[in-house]
Amino acid sequence: MGQSRNDASKRMTVKEFLEAIENLEETIYQIQITNKFKKSLDLSYRRSLDLKLLKDVIHTLAKGDKLEAKHRPHTLERFKTVVWECHIKPDWLLLWQQTDEGLILILLDTGTHSDLF
């Protein structure tokens, strides 16, 4: 059965997601969000993806903790700079860069395999 109107109203909105990211606690990385990421975030919301799952992964990264193996974090070879990718769900990915020198986490993009590649 599809999502009821009540269930849909409990979903985290894009605005709530951005506020939650801004107010994450116990983080060591400063989070920067690209415009591309924001546009892709809107698309993820329209696809009814659970933004809380994405927030939880980003919080783990911002704390400097390792992601669980189910997220399959790895670097991508196709970029000039080091870009990381992980799976939020099997066909929902997060792309980011991080610098340990300045402790900055840059959220580059999110979407499906076909969106990103």
Each model region followed by its residue ranges:
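Conserved N-terminal boundary motif of the eukaryotic protein kinase catalytic domain
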Residues: 81-83
